[in-house]
A protein has these predicted regions:
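Active-site-proximal acidic secondary-structure segment that organizes catalysis
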Residues: 138, 186-236
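Small-residue-rich loop/turn and linker elements
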Residues: 87-130, 162
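Acyl/amide activation-and-transfer machinery of modular secondary-metabolite enzymes
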Residues: 41-60, 111-135, 205-211
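Short, positively charged and aromatic/hydrophobic N-terminal segments
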Residues: 7-17
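Helical lid/core segments from catalytic subdomains that handle acyl or acyl-like groups
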Residues: 119-174
Length: 236
């Protein structure tokens, strides 16, 4: 009982701290105007880039400090995406303003981000939670551990509808060269996926696949994010 009340108080505190809202913006007033016009009409607007990362430092910190490798990687991802302006904008299909059943593409701007994490729950299924991006590792780790433990036990997702979400998926049952996600037309947020890291003689490597909607960003923005992610991993 007290555990449930504690979880409820935690969620209420988080909601009180984050009362900001996403805002609809005119694509023509942004640097995504042409891309938005072109790629929201495409039958396949998603792009996947795969880069092999040197995660030697990440693995050492994980072992030395007793922190989860996946948590550390998600923290690094959050720090990297927060430095790229294009991540704060996301196209979405929404009902038209005339009240009909028609749908249209709109562009939204967010002022905060969260990392979506998937966890195995006690019923043998999967549960999801959104962990707020933070520059502070201890804060992020506390939120990550609390939320993943909560969804594991309750089998109830904890999601943040007012943050731009960066999806993640760790398929650690095997080493993988690349993961290509399918486009459903529903889940269009940025998405990173990886398998098991490879332990070599001198370094540990991990291929990470990054999928994004081309209306949201171009290849140069994605490349800058991947370079920034590697830099942050090295500097942790």
């Amino acid at each position: 009982m007290f555990g449930c009340l504690g979880n409820f108080a935690y969620l209420c505190k988080s909601l009180q701290t984050n009362k900001t809202m996403k805002q609809e913006i005119n694509p023509k007033d942004t640097n995504r105007a042409i891309a938005f016009e072109l790629w929201t009409k495409s039958s396949m607007p998603m792009v996947t880039l795969t880069k092999t990362f040197d995660v030697t430092r990440l693995r050492k910190v994980s072992r030395k400090r007793g922190l989860k490798f996946n948590m550390l990687l998600c923290w690094c991802i959050g720090r990297a995406v927060s430095k790229i302006d294009e991540f704060y904008m996301l196209p979405q299909r929404q009902p038209t303003d005339d009240g009909t059943s028609e749908m249209e593409w709109k562009l939204y701007k967010y002022d905060r981000m969260a990392i979506n994490v998937i966890a195995d729950n006690v019923k043998g299924g999967l549960s999801f939670c959104d962990v707020a991006v933070s520059d502070d590792l201890e804060t992020f780790n506390a939120n990550y551990m609390h939320l993943t433990e909560t969804i594991t036990q309750t089998c109830q997702d904890i999601l943040d509808d007012e943050a731009v979400i960066v999806g993640t998926s760790a398929v650690t049952g095997t080493e993988l060269d690349s993961i290509v996600n399918q486009y459903s037309g529903i889940f269009i947020n940025p998405f990173l996926a990886w398998g098991r890291y490879h332990k070599g003689w001198l370094k540990t490597t991990l291929p990470i696949s990054f999928q994004f909607h081309h209306a949201q960003m171009d290849g140069k923005h994605a490349a800058r994010f991947l370079e920034e992610l590697q830099r942050i991993i090295h500097s942790i």
